[in-house]
Amino acid sequence: PELNKTFDGDRITSITGQPVGLAVATENHVVFAPVVQATVETPFAELVAQTRDLIGRTRAGQIRAEDAVPAAITISNLGMYGVSAFTAMVTPPQVMVLSVGAIRRVPAFDAQGAVVAQSIMTLTLGSDHRVINGAQAATFLGAIAQWLQKVPS
Protein backbone atom coordinates (compact mmCIF):
# COMPACT_ATOMS: atom_id res chain seq x y z
CA PRO A 1 0.00 0.00 0.00
CA GLU A 2 2.80 2.49 0.72
CA LEU A 3 3.97 2.13 -2.90
CA ASN A 4 0.52 2.29 -4.48
CA LYS A 5 0.58 6.00 -5.24
CA THR A 6 0.62 8.47 -8.11
CA PHE A 7 2.26 11.90 -8.21
CA ASP A 8 1.24 14.77 -10.46
CA GLY A 9 4.07 17.12 -9.47
CA ASP A 10 2.07 18.79 -6.73
CA ARG A 11 0.10 16.08 -4.98
CA ILE A 12 0.68 12.46 -3.96
CA THR A 13 -2.48 10.37 -4.35
CA SER A 14 -3.05 6.88 -2.94
CA ILE A 15 -4.83 4.56 -5.36
CA THR A 16 -7.05 1.60 -4.57
CA GLY A 17 -6.56 -1.91 -5.85
CA GLN A 18 -3.29 -2.99 -7.41
CA PRO A 19 -3.44 -1.70 -10.99
CA VAL A 20 -0.35 -2.40 -13.11
CA GLY A 21 0.27 -0.57 -16.39
CA LEU A 22 1.64 -2.57 -19.31
CA ALA A 23 3.70 -0.75 -21.93
CA VAL A 24 2.24 -1.97 -25.25
CA ALA A 25 3.60 -0.83 -28.62
CA THR A 26 1.23 -0.76 -31.57
CA GLU A 27 2.29 -1.38 -35.16
CA ASN A 28 2.56 2.43 -35.56
CA HIS A 29 5.11 2.43 -32.69
CA VAL A 30 2.71 4.32 -30.43
CA VAL A 31 3.09 3.08 -26.87
CA PHE A 32 0.08 2.82 -24.58
CA ALA A 33 0.07 1.69 -20.95
CA PRO A 34 -3.32 0.08 -20.34
CA VAL A 35 -3.85 -1.33 -16.86
CA VAL A 36 -4.39 -4.88 -15.65
CA GLN A 37 -5.90 -5.31 -12.19
CA ALA A 38 -3.61 -7.72 -10.35
CA THR A 39 -3.03 -8.74 -6.76
CA VAL A 40 -0.43 -10.93 -5.12
CA GLU A 41 -3.19 -13.54 -4.78
CA THR A 42 -4.07 -13.53 -8.51
CA PRO A 43 -3.24 -16.99 -9.90
CA PHE A 44 -0.44 -16.79 -12.46
CA ALA A 45 -2.55 -18.40 -15.22
CA GLU A 46 -5.29 -15.80 -14.70
CA LEU A 47 -2.74 -12.99 -14.78
CA VAL A 48 -1.33 -14.32 -18.07
CA ALA A 49 -4.84 -14.53 -19.57
CA GLN A 50 -5.72 -10.97 -18.47
CA THR A 51 -2.43 -9.65 -19.82
CA ARG A 52 -2.80 -11.37 -23.21
CA ASP A 53 -6.37 -10.07 -23.54
CA LEU A 54 -5.33 -6.52 -22.66
CA ILE A 55 -2.36 -6.52 -25.04
CA GLY A 56 -4.49 -7.95 -27.86
CA ARG A 57 -7.22 -5.36 -27.39
CA THR A 58 -4.65 -2.55 -27.20
CA ARG A 59 -2.99 -3.58 -30.46
CA ALA A 60 -6.43 -3.89 -32.09
CA GLY A 61 -7.35 -0.37 -30.96
CA GLN A 62 -10.05 -1.65 -28.60
CA ILE A 63 -8.94 -0.14 -25.28
CA ARG A 64 -11.85 0.54 -22.93
CA ALA A 65 -12.16 3.36 -20.38
CA GLU A 66 -11.58 0.91 -17.50
CA ASP A 67 -8.25 -0.08 -19.11
CA ALA A 68 -6.91 3.45 -18.60
CA VAL A 69 -7.18 3.89 -14.83
CA PRO A 70 -4.24 5.33 -12.85
CA ALA A 71 -1.51 2.89 -11.84
CA ALA A 72 1.53 3.33 -9.61
CA ILE A 73 3.76 1.18 -11.85
CA THR A 74 4.18 0.26 -15.49
CA ILE A 75 5.96 -2.85 -16.73
CA SER A 76 8.07 -2.41 -19.86
CA ASN A 77 9.27 -5.66 -21.46
CA LEU A 78 11.95 -5.18 -24.10
CA GLY A 79 13.14 -8.70 -23.34
CA MET A 80 10.71 -9.91 -26.00
CA TYR A 81 12.94 -8.08 -28.51
CA GLY A 82 16.08 -9.80 -27.18
CA VAL A 83 17.22 -6.82 -25.09
CA SER A 84 19.05 -8.14 -22.01
CA ALA A 85 18.94 -5.01 -19.86
CA PHE A 86 17.64 -1.46 -20.17
CA THR A 87 16.31 1.35 -18.04
CA ALA A 88 12.82 2.66 -18.79
CA MET A 89 11.85 6.11 -17.58
CA VAL A 90 9.08 6.75 -15.06
CA THR A 91 6.13 8.45 -16.75
CA PRO A 92 4.14 10.68 -14.40
CA PRO A 93 1.77 10.39 -12.69
CA GLN A 94 3.16 6.89 -12.12
CA VAL A 95 5.95 6.58 -9.57
CA MET A 96 7.66 3.36 -10.72
CA VAL A 97 8.58 1.53 -13.90
CA LEU A 98 9.82 -2.06 -14.06
CA SER A 99 12.14 -2.83 -16.99
CA VAL A 100 12.11 -6.53 -17.92
CA GLY A 101 15.01 -7.95 -19.93
CA ALA A 102 15.29 -11.13 -21.99
CA ILE A 103 15.57 -14.52 -20.33
CA ARG A 104 19.03 -15.95 -20.99
CA ARG A 105 20.57 -19.35 -20.27
CA VAL A 106 23.93 -19.08 -18.50
CA PRO A 107 26.27 -21.50 -16.75
CA ALA A 108 25.90 -21.54 -12.96
CA PHE A 109 26.92 -23.74 -10.04
CA ASP A 110 24.34 -25.91 -8.27
CA ALA A 111 24.44 -26.72 -4.52
CA GLN A 112 26.97 -29.53 -5.11
CA GLY A 113 29.30 -27.31 -7.17
CA ALA A 114 28.42 -28.83 -10.55
CA VAL A 115 28.02 -26.53 -13.54
CA VAL A 116 24.40 -26.38 -14.72
CA ALA A 117 22.42 -24.23 -17.14
CA GLN A 118 20.33 -21.60 -15.39
CA SER A 119 17.81 -19.08 -16.71
CA ILE A 120 18.36 -15.47 -15.68
CA MET A 121 16.56 -12.25 -16.44
CA THR A 122 17.55 -8.69 -15.59
CA LEU A 123 14.96 -6.54 -13.84
CA THR A 124 15.51 -2.82 -13.32
CA LEU A 125 13.17 -0.69 -11.22
CA GLY A 126 13.06 3.06 -11.67
CA SER A 127 11.23 5.08 -9.04
CA ASP A 128 10.35 8.70 -8.38
CA HIS A 129 12.33 9.42 -5.21
CA ARG A 130 10.01 12.26 -4.30
CA VAL A 131 7.48 9.53 -3.46
CA ILE A 132 9.32 6.18 -3.17
CA ASN A 133 12.68 6.00 -1.39
CA GLY A 134 15.49 3.70 -2.50
CA ALA A 135 15.02 1.21 0.33
CA GLN A 136 11.31 0.83 -0.49
CA ALA A 137 12.12 0.36 -4.18
CA ALA A 138 14.84 -2.22 -3.42
CA THR A 139 12.54 -4.20 -1.12
CA PHE A 140 9.79 -4.16 -3.77
CA LEU A 141 12.19 -5.27 -6.53
CA GLY A 142 13.45 -8.10 -4.30
CA ALA A 143 9.87 -9.25 -3.69
CA ILE A 144 9.18 -9.25 -7.44
CA ALA A 145 12.33 -11.29 -8.09
CA GLN A 146 11.36 -13.84 -5.42
CA TRP A 147 7.83 -14.09 -6.84
CA LEU A 148 9.16 -14.65 -10.37
CA GLN A 149 11.47 -17.43 -9.17
CA LYS A 150 8.38 -19.33 -7.96
CA VAL A 151 6.42 -18.94 -11.21
CA PRO A 152 6.06 -22.23 -13.11
CA SER A 153 8.12 -22.34 -16.31
Model-derived features with residue positions:
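C-terminal catalytic/motor cores of large multi-domain enzyme assemblies
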Residues: 1-153
